[in-house]
Amino acid sequence: AKFCGNQYSDREWLIAPIRDHGFLWATNAEILVCVPDDPNVSAKDGCPANLIKFHEWFKLAGNFNKINAEAIPKAKRCPSCNGSGIWPAFGDDPEETCQECNGSGEYKNQEVSVGAQHISRWYLALIASLENAQLSCSSDAPTAPMFFKFEGGWGCVMPIKPRSKS
C-alpha cells in the first residue's frame, strides 16, 4: 500500500494494488512497483494498458547501480504541517493526517540529483528501503522514467524537473 495512492487521490483506481498479466501492480502515478502475483493479496483486476508498456520499457533498461542509502540526504520537514504529519484542528474540524506528506512529516518534493536526473528524496529513500534495490538512470534523457529493480520485483519512478537555481 505504500506505493499506492492515498485516500486523497483523485484517481480512485490508484488506491489499491491491481492484478493483471500475472503481476501485482501498485502505483500512485509518480512511482510504480510490480511484483509476481500473490493470490493472498487483495487487489483489483485489470490494469490500464499504459502500465503494461512500462514492463516492456523495463526490459530495455540497463546500467543498474546499487543505491547507497547512507548517501541519501536527511529529510527536510514538510512545510504544510511543519514536520508533525498532522494538520491541526481548525474551528470544529478535528485534526487530520497531512495530505502533503501523508503523515510522514517529510517534505515529499525535496530534490536529489542522481546522475543527470533528479528524483524526490522521499521516493529515493522508499526505493532504497527495498531489498537489494538498484536504480537505472538515463544520462541523455533527464525526464525519462527511472527504472529500479529489487529482490522480487521491479518498478519505475518519474524524475522531477530540476528547480532553477536563482
Q: What do the PLM-derived regions correspond to, one by one?
A:
Residues 27-166:
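C-terminal functional regions that serve as terminal interaction/effector modules
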Residues 1-35:
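Intrinsically disordered, low-complexity linker/loop segments enriched in Gly/Pro
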